[in-house]
Amino acid sequence: MKRYLSVLAAVIFLMSVVSAQTDKDIISTREMERINWMEFKDVVPSKTSTVLLPTGTLEPHGVINNGADNTAPFAMAKTIAQRTNAMIAPTLPYGMTGSLEAYPGAFQITEAAYRPFVKQILEGLVKNGFRSIIILNGHGGGQSAVLNSVASEVAIEKHVRTLVINWWTFASEETKEVFGEDGGHAGNNETAFIQAIDKTLVHPEKYKGPEMTTALPAPAGSWSAVPFPSSIELYQKNQGYPTFDQAKADLYYKKVTDKVAGLINETVKKWDLAGL
């Protein structure tokens, strides 16, 4: 029995060592703004040619931080960078805010300024050796369309591969799975995502109930208001109110990041398989 236990202990120890070696990253840091230029030269593109670019904006988000659209994609990038073997470009924190720009602390960048700036960032990533550029977008509205357009232009002009992911839309089924209903801008899904990242950015005491929310126009295009009357915008009426449930927040974060990582790995694998 003692011999058996000794062998078992040795096996468990060996497995832990192998696991630790497997988990150890091949790069000292995945963040481009933290890595030294000499290590970057040794890593890109020989060890990785994939980069994650978080994009967002500054605008009100109910009872969470104004920079939620930046916080979410950057945290996601850090969570999935190693398993997608990707570097992380610095977050682009200013964007095309739209109908919430009148709220305190919000910033609005025009399309005329935003489009060429994003294009030069993508071109800079190509120049630095990246062939697969993944935009993790945290803000919707007109910004999503511009990112899609610019990413497509760069892919065609520079003969690289681009993928734009609007995480809240991509994870709509996970929202319904975890919360049992649809979500919203600064609603149950986005509030939970931020709560899982940093609960100090969430202020339940400031939530006064449904009067702080407004459902998006239904049917779409039936009405328009600027500024939008609430910073919590429900995708469907009477669904998506913030719940502040930590267990659901943690589960949701894991499901979303797992799904996004899976999409990236599958897409890059198929690009490679096709020789693109």
Identify the role of each PLM range.
Residues 1-4:
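Positively charged n-region of N-terminal signal peptides that target proteins for export
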Residues 21-86, 90-98, 104-112, 116-134, ...:
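Extended, histidine- and acidic-residue-enriched regions that form the cofactor-binding/catalytic faces
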